[in-house]
Regions:
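Membrane-interface anchor segments at the N-terminal boundary of transmembrane helices
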Residues: 14-18, 253, 257-344
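Transmembrane-helix motifs of polytopic, lipid-linked glycan transferases
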Residues: 21-42, 80
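Specific aromatic-rich, kink-prone transmembrane helix
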Residues: 74-91, 104-106, 123-124, 373-377
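Loop-to-helix entry region of an early transmembrane alpha helix in multi-pass inner-membrane enzymes
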Residues: 7-29, 64
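Short helix- or helix-capping micro-motifs
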Residues: 48-59, 79, 106, 110
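Short acidic/glycine- and proline-prone juxtamembrane loop motifs at membrane-interface regions
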Residues: 63-73
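Membrane-proximal stem/loop segments at transmembrane-domain junctions that anchor or position
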Residues: 162-291
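Membrane-interface alpha helices of multi-pass inner-membrane proteins
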Residues: 98-113, 124-125, 144-150
Length: 391
């Protein structure tokens, strides 16, 4: 969008504005598709209004709609994909529109975030099993999404010299666990210490180690000899396993410190407090059409209310979103609606990918897809079997 519009207008502000408008429409479209899905299931208008209010009145949705991050269209793709699964499985709406949504949103999930690719691969076998009775209709868009994403991700991106995340990005948690063992002055054999020192200088590792933030140690590895780590993966895997068996408490503590924000309910995170355009020399500037102190103060209060109002503040908690997902799955199991479990697959697979490789303990945008899909998870758990039975 940016390069196309810039080529037409030669104006960077217009090009960025067009992309921002597209992102706003994409996010709004995903919500509209969700509401339409519920309407087709005869959900009561009052419930639909409550869900609409969640998206319209919670301020971080509005701020994120104009925030140029890949996490925002990614979250919209997850909601599209989840709703398409609901339509195709529970509602049995096999049509070209829903299959097209499944395909396009599947490609977006695979390409917009690196963990999305792995989550899609993790969920795919279960999706294939869940749709085994509708294989002729559903399998083609799923495999087509996988094939197109693989072609774009590897040969095309390689041809255009698009850099993929380096290896250390995918091993943030094991790296933090090994670092915790070192910083706790645990015993290491001479061979283990020598292997680690082939990659990093241990002189300042205690000063750099942050239990909730892996970037310091990642940069230490990059400043050292990351190539040695990549070429000796087996040795470092054995080292990680050996230290884990020897010091399980250190590993568990390091893991909790690195991931608690995504599953601990009392983990408020100030969201969307920064708005505007970061200072650059590219000519893009923040030019609000509606300004004034009243607007600014209203926005500030709306954002800060999450830290002031107890129940309302749970909507700012990533941990609460995680437990809502688990609660919804539990309700479906208790009600013996096992066929609905397939609708939770994208969220579960993506959450597991975050918990397996997050570089920071609290980052709302990493699990914004979970928050955007909150009403979907809750309403899916209580959907009646018959489409004409209102909720």
């Amino acid at each position: 969008f940016y390069y196309f519009c810039y080529g037409l207008t030669k104006n960077m502000v217009i090009a960025v504005s067009v992309y921002t408008f597209f992102q706003m429409c994409l996010l709004a479209g995903s919500v509209a598709y969700f509401i339409s899905t519920l309407r087709s299931h005869k959900i009561r208008p009052f419930v639909l209004l409550l869900i609409t209010a969640f998206y319209a009145l919670i301020p971080y949705h509005a701020v994120f709609s104009v925030t140029v991050w890949k996490d925002i269209p990614f979250a919209a793709a997850v909601l599209f994909f989840s709703c398409a699964i609901l339509r195709l499985s529970v509602q049995n709406q096999i049509c070209l529109k829903n299959l097209a949504v499944l395909f396009i949103s599947g490609v977006m999930i695979c390409l917009f975030r690196s963990n999305g690719w792995y989550a899609f691969l993790l969920a795919l076998p279960f999706l294939l099993f869940g749709f085994r009775h509708k294989a002729k209709a559903v399998y083609p868009p799923l495999f087509a999404a996988l094939l197109l994403a693989a072609v774009v991700k590897y040969p095309i991106m390689s041809a255009f010299r698009v850099e993929q995340p380096d290896f250390i990005e995918s091993v943030s948690i094991p790296m933090q666990q090994i670092t915790a063992v070192i910083c706790n002055d645990r015993y290491l054999t001479e061979e283990e210490r020598a292997l680690i020192e082939e990659v990093v200088d241990l002189t300042y590792i205690r000063d750099l180690y942050n239990p909730t933030f892996a970037d310091n140690i990642k940069e230490l590895v990059r400043a050292g000899n990351q190539d040695y780590l990549v070429s000796h993966k087996d040795e470092f895997l054995n080292l990680w396993i050996a230290l884990g068996l020897r010091y399980p408490g250190d590993y568990l503590t390091a893991y909790v410190n690195q991931t608690y924000g995504y599953w601990y309910p009392d983990s408020f995170y100030l969201v969307a407090e920064a708005e505007g355009v970061s200072a650059t020399d590219l000519g893009v500037s923040h030019t609000p059409l509606i300004g004034g102190p009243l607007v600014i103060k209203t926005k500030e209060i709306a954002i800060k209310l999450g830290s002031m109002v107890p129940i309302y503040g749970t909507l700012w908690s990533m941990g609460v979103a995680c437990w809502v997902l688990l609660f919804s799955i539990s309700v479906s199991v208790i009600r013996r609606d096992y066929h609905k479990l397939i609708c939770y697959l994208p969220g579960v697979a993506l959450l597991l990918s975050v918990l397996a490789a997050t570089p920071v303990a609290t980052e709302f945008r990493y699990v914004y897809f979970l928050v955007l899909c909150l009403p979907f998870y809750l309403i899916t758990a209580v959907l009646p079997e018959e489409a004409d039975a209102p909720v």
